[in-house]
Swiss-Prot record:
Catalyzes the dehydration of methylthioribulose-1-phosphate (MTRu-1-P) into 2,3-diketo-5-methylthiopentyl-1-phosphate (DK-MTP-1-P). This is Methylthioribulose-1-phosphate dehydratase. One of its GO terms (molecular function) is zinc ion binding. Keywords: Amino-acid biosynthesis, Lyase, Metal-binding, Methionine biosynthesis, Zinc. It catalyses: 5-(methylsulfanyl)-D-ribulose 1-phosphate = 5-methylsulfanyl-2,3-dioxopentyl phosphate + H2O. Pfam families: Aldolase_II (PF00596). Pathway: Amino-acid biosynthesis; L-methionine biosynthesis via salvage pathway; L-methionine from S-methyl-5-thio-alpha-D-ribose 1-phosphate: step 2/6. It comes from Pectobacterium carotovorum subsp. carotovorum (strain PC1). The keyword Lyase applies.
Length: 205
């Protein structure tokens, strides 16, 4: 896929995310890998539902350097960390949905475990509802390098798959392509909504 095709796919994903209401008030950030050295990421403070091609900035994956001198998303370091750690990741989507934000606070443990849902099969490699899918949860931190270090420490002993939550903040998810990242995002959002509803109903029982 050419750079223009990748950007077109990411723009479409951003507009779809905006329509879903998963990135209100200019929140969130999205990126796509161009090659081993560079990615494109959303500029800071842009509404995701109305992004244009010029709202994406070229970033050097190894250093987070932005040749244009413009300001990328504050969380650029988490995107580039994922690209450095896993060469198969081709796109990263970070959203601020209500379900992901609330569930990340309701769950007090270090992981959100999803089990028994048919839609787990929307995640690459998952073939049955009987498996347990663990989504790590990291405490929020305005110090992005410190947060990235905690993600790195986790990934040193447990593979990062599909995505992770930042408590009270939102979801990071990814895929080999923008298309796969979109599917993972939609699948996880459905699963989060189911899990949140299940917990609410059980609490009332």
């Amino acid at each position: 896929m050419t750079e223009n095709q990748q950007l077109t796919a990411l723009l479409a994903a951003c507009h779809w995310i905006g329509e879903k209401g998963w990135c209100p008030a200019t929140g969130g950030n999205m990126s796509v890998r161009l090659d081993d050295a560079q990615c494109l990421i959303t500029e800071s403070g842009k509404d995701k539902g109305s992004l244009q091609a010029e709202d994406f900035l070229l970033v050097e994956i190894a250093t987070n350097h932005v040749p244009s001198g413009r300001t990328p998303s504050a969380e650029t370091g988490l995107h580039t960390l994922l690209y450095r750690r896993e060469p198969t990741i081709g796109a990263v989507l970070h959203t601020h949905s209500v379900n992901a934000t609330v569930l990340s606070r309701v769950e007090k443990g270090a992981e959100l475990v999803l089990h028994g849902y048919e839609m787990q099969k929307s995640l690459a490699g998952q073939t049955t509802h009987l498996d347990r899918v663990a989504i790590p949860i990291f405490d929020n931190d305005q110090d992005i390098p410190a947060l990235a270090q905690r993600v790195t420490e986790y990934a040193s002993h447990t593979p990062l798959r599909y995505g992770f939550l930042v408590r009270g903040h939102g979801l990071y998810c990814w895929g080999a392509t923008v298309k796969e990242a979109r599917r993972h995002l939609e699948g996880l959002e459905f699963l989060f909504q189911c899990e949140l509803q299940r917990r609410l109903l059980e609490a009332k029982a």
